[in-house]
Amino acid sequence: MAAPRPPPAISVSVSAPAFYAPQKKFAPVVAPKPKVNPFRPGDSEPPVAAGAQRAQMGRVGEIPPPPPEDFPLPPPPLIGEGDDSEGALGGAFPPPPPPMIEEPFPPAPLEEDIFPSPPPPLEEEGGPEAPTQLPPQPREKVCSIDLEIDSLSSLLDDMTKNDPFKARVSSGYVPPPVATPFVPKPSTKPAPGGTAPLPPWKTPSSSQPPPQPQAKPQVQLHVQPQAKPHVQPQPVSSANTQPRGPLSQAPTPAPKFAPVAPKFTPVVSKFSPGAPSGPGPQPNQKMVPPDAPSSVSTGSPQPPSFTYAQQKEKPLVQEKQHPQPPPAQNQNQVRSPGGPGPLTLKEVEELEQLTQQLMQDMEHPQRQSVAVNESCGKCNQPLARAQPAVRALGQLFHITCFTCHQCQQQLQGQQFYSLEGAPYCEGCYTDTLEKCNTCGQPITDRMLRATGKAYHPQCFTCVVCACPLEGTSFIVDQANQPHCVPDYHKQYAPRCSVCSEPIMPEPGRDETVRVVALDKNFHMKCYKCEDCGKPLSIEADDNGCFPLDGHVLCRKCHSARAQT
């Protein structure tokens, strides 16, 4: 039968060993395991004793102890309490089934020789590898079980390569649980006594060394169904009580398994990092089952099973993320119009225009340089490209032709001055400059021109006090010498006949005000009567001046002197 089983054996082997690995007695419980088929990879060498015992108790479904939560098998559960504990444990892939149900399973009878095929759980998960062959494969002899284990290991290897678990998890489909026929035993009922899963697993594993290799694949399968049995599948216990025949009726609890699958995936992810160490002290919790099998079993087979389960879980998460790609496509669509839109074309056109303009700008100066074939600015002879030339005053000259306009000195590499469009050396240019009327030096910088002469600004000063006259009023005397206003009045202004002071303009004024009477000059303040000192008016009225014998008098004093 090993040859026809390969496909179905993949699922069957995954489920059956998970439950019956520690003790061959629980091998018939494979029916509930198919639901957990995503956990197939562990079939190669899962923890033989511990995992198998718990798997048998919680997952097998053959015996009444399997709780409804752990096993969503169609048959009604015989033991509700045990089912509940197993269901909680089954929720997480790594945790083994509840200890109560698991303890009875470890003492599984040798009748496990009848090894049911777990294809129905694969179909429930919706994995492509799930075999359609639900009928269990009875194996009454231990030797046949060994052969079946070998076939299961090969099938599990094929399943790991194909990764059917991802498809199963992603689909989320939970086919009705089909329990393969198995031989139930009274050991399953003492599930309450098996609350402590660790001791029972250890004892059965030690008692029966040969069934342990079979239990390794069973433990992995058992952990997987536990993830699903979050839905309380009481029919699992009934399936345990029922013989192999009722396993075919498992499809009824399919809806329960469907919710279990999603729960299992998150639990597995949580458990996968520290499954073997942490959950050991908590046998009732979902995390506990994985710890017990790891401690009881050799340990080498169980880690691969967990890793395989973890790998399966990762694909599940990826499948959940797959629906997200459409928004990414929408983003790409938005970007696509922005990137390849007309804006990019316009920018390209602008760049092309700029490059063309730059090329044209560069070509024009090159053309000018090409047109350098000009004639000399002095001799009008053409200039050869290889011949050195001097560019000055906007023209080109032969080196021998670029000379001073006056002394004919070559000016190449020297400072020169331009005067009326002709080059001059520094000496000749200085000779052409005007000289200051005061110091006689050529004026090379600023020049002040006054009275028809050129001066340095600092040389144009008053001839009396030498104060600078730039920007101020000045008066020139008869010798054409500049004077400041005060010095000029002091020297040339008329003097008052009374005070003998020069008559000067008042401060802030440029005009001079004076009174002339009897051929004499007076200040306004000095024009008054000589006898009484009364100010006289410049008007011809009674307050005016009444001269008498050369004296300036008022009318009253004039009358008094005239009577005498």
Curated annotation (Swiss-Prot):
Pfam families: LIM. Its main location: cytoplasm. One of its GO terms (cellular component) is focal adhesion. The keyword Signal does not apply. It is found in: Cytoplasm; Cytoplasm, Cytoskeleton; Cell junction, Focal adhesion; Nucleus. Residues 255-275 have a biased composition (Low complexity). Residues 63-78, 93-109, 174-189, 197-214 have a biased composition (Pro residues). One of its GO terms (biological process) is stress fiber assembly. Gene3D superfamilies: Cysteine Rich Protein (2.10.110.10). GO terms for molecular function: metal ion binding. Residues 311-322 have a biased composition (Basic and acidic residues). Residues 376-435, 436-495, 496-562 form the LIM zinc-binding domain. It comes from the Eukaryota. InterPro entries: Znf_LIM. SMART domains: LIM (SM00132). Residues 234-243, 294-310 have a biased composition (Polar residues). The keyword Zinc applies. The modification N6-acetyllysine is found at K256, K263, K270. PROSITE patterns: LIM_DOMAIN_1, LIM_DOMAIN_2. The modification Asymmetric dimethylarginine is found at R244. The modification Phosphoserine is found at S117, S144, S170, S171, S272, S300, S336. Belongs to the zyxin/ajuba family. Interacts, via the Pro-rich regions, with the EVH1 domains of ENAH, EVL and VASP. Interacts with the first LIM domain of TES. Interacts with SYNPO2. Adhesion plaque protein. Binds alpha-actinin and the CRP protein. Important for targeting TES and ENA/VASP family members to focal adhesions and for the formation of actin-rich structures. May be a component of a signal transduction pathway that mediates adhesion-stimulated changes in gene expression. This is Zyxin. It comes from Mus musculus. The gene is Zyx.
